[in-house]
Amino acid sequence: MIVITLPDGSQREFPGPVTVAEVAASIGTGLAKAALGGRVDGKLVDTGHRIEGDARLAIVTDKDADGLDLIRHSTAHLLAYAVKELFPEAQVTIGPVIENGFYYDFSYKRPFTPEDLAAIEAKMTELAKKDEKVERRVLPRDEAVAYFKSIGEDYKAEIIAGIPAGQDVSLYREGRFEDLCRGPHVPSTGKLRHFKLMKVAGAYWRGDHRNEMLQRIYGTAWASKDELQQYLHMLEEAEKRDHRKLGRELDLFHLDEHAPGLVFWHPKGWTVWQQVEQYMRAVYRDNGYLEVKGPQILDQGLWEKTGHWDKYRENMFVTESEKRDYALKPMNCPGHILIYKQGIKSYRDLPLRYGEFGQCHRNEPTGGLHGIMRVRGFTQDDGHIFCTEEHILPECVAYTALLQKVYKDFGFNDIIYKVATRPEKRIGSDAVWDKAEHALMESLRASGCEFVVSPGDGAFYGPKIEYTLKDALGRQWQCGTMQVDFSLPERLDAVYVAESGERLFPVMLHRAIVGSLERFIGILIEQHAGALPAWLAPVQVMVLNITDGQADYAAEIAKTLQKQGVRAGVDLRNEKITYKIREHSMQKLPYILVVGDKEKAAGAVAVRARGNQDLGVMPLDAFSQRMASDIAHKV
């Protein structure tokens, strides 16, 4: 007898080997119909998987995260099937699941057009309606190579040829299409009903620019029509909020082919940058951080000591001068240790907190660049705390509270907390890791934060907390980090004198709140759809005159506000007032002040708030108080 234990602890007995589908059917016809796969002793498998002995089994349906992955993986194969039906000469390569969807790369003699994409999607729908069974078979490696060569799929043959000799490979067939795949997959194409193809892009074979440029078709797939529609609606909203589009429209920044991955900040955009930086500078000052500044170029020898030269060199920009090799720093930590090492440090000096708006450069591949969110040159609000093991808990508690306040001030209230614990390969004793992991978790508990643990995801040199924002569209952005480091101070021989007189290595806490300022400003632009709160807005107020008769008064109003520290402008153009109001409203200004003869005579202003709100006529002092309140309360 084979005993199958279900998630609720109940057990079912079978006289011999049994498939996942058969177990589901024994539970009920509804579950049998809904089953997409199963988890057998933790391993995700097809419904056709045979269970040969006692096992724990969870049936996977479209209500599970695993089920959604199965749907997306199988829809990628459905895409390839449709392409081969419509374009038999196309060669298939790879098609993985990605966040919110999937893609598949194809080699074809001409670019796919939008009309092709529509035809492919229609063919996918047609094939799904056939509800063709998805079947798995296993071949020896060499036989699989020969098979794919015989049907003209050279890329698949090349992939399989890279698998060790003597190893079997699995293939999945649906209808007339068969593909190399580890699986698992849904039991039939009829399970794939809610999908959409999104776009075509270029991608090099195996990610190598020396290889052929392939065509990558992206798609999304969901468990229900409602979920698909919600996702597509979110994408429409995201497109409206796209920081690249708003950056152009609001004249904040631009990107140029002469400097790929680097940002040209315009006056308005640089004003936003300055507001974020000055806010964070005050955070440093008010929380015991000493601001420092390190050089951008450091000698190869330092990067060899830190381990970056071996592990990270491909992502570093290197240069040479007078027969010495240097690198633009990809991070600020080594520089902070060199500052720490100047002079003897005592246990009385700890914790010692350094902060820097450090400009870093990383040689990101061109295909990975994205507006100001993913760049090659960026500035971090980078902080490092040198401390003892006993300081880890209180420092993390203080940091989490600080981070929560900062995020709230910028308009983010939904934060996800994750603790990444020790990996298999690590340095330091288990006792030290126990203490560090406990301190990180206790710091979150003390801050009233629910968190998830991600086992094994810590760095080799220490565990960390990741702080992820949720924006107005529900998207997640990992910004903040608190990383414990037992390694780098020792690598660079940074010590402190303990109370006993012994020289010890400090613990180093790497922390950032907003992370890359470029990326964070991009997130802010999208969070607020370009309508930044008054305290951040590059232009807070625009004063408009109705006729030339109020030009001097309008200019005087703007000058008075500027003296009060308000970022005010004045538009004295001889244009219709409705035209000027509409034009400045499109710039998403917090306030527009209109002055005509009545306002001039009364020493007042007519106030229009963002969103076409008419706040009426008020004395300038009253408006100034309102503006000051908005800035003080970060609205």
From Swiss-Prot:
Residues 242-533 are annotated as: Catalytic. GO terms for cellular component: cytoplasm. Pfam families: HGTP_anticodon, TGS, tRNA-synt_2b, tRNA_SAD. Residues 1-61 form the TGS domain. Its EC number is 6.1.1.3. Binds 1 zinc ion per subunit. Keywords: Aminoacyl-tRNA synthetase, ATP-binding, Cytoplasm, Ligase, Metal-binding, Nucleotide-binding, Protein biosynthesis, RNA-binding, tRNA-binding, Zinc. It catalyses: tRNA(Thr) + L-threonine + ATP = L-threonyl-tRNA(Thr) + AMP + diphosphate + H(+). It is an enzyme of class 6 (ligase). Its cofactor is Zn(2+). InterPro entries: aa-tRNA-synt_IIb, aa-tRNA-synth_II, aa-tRNA-synth_II/BPL/LPL, Anticodon-bd, Anticodon-bd_dom_sf, Beta-grasp_dom_sf, TGS, TGS-like. GO terms for biological process: threonyl-tRNA aminoacylation. The keyword Aminoacyl-tRNA synthetase applies. Catalyzes the attachment of threonine to tRNA(Thr) in a two-step reaction: L-threonine is first activated by ATP to form Thr-AMP and then transferred to the acceptor end of tRNA(Thr). Also edits incorrectly charged L-seryl-tRNA(Thr). Belongs to the class-II aminoacyl-tRNA synthetase family. PANTHER family: THREONINE--TRNA LIGASE, CHLOROPLASTIC_MITOCHONDRIAL 2, THREONINE-TRNA LIGASE. Homodimer. This is Threonine--tRNA ligase. It comes from Methylibium petroleiphilum (strain ATCC BAA-1232 / LMG 22953 / PM1). The gene is thrS.
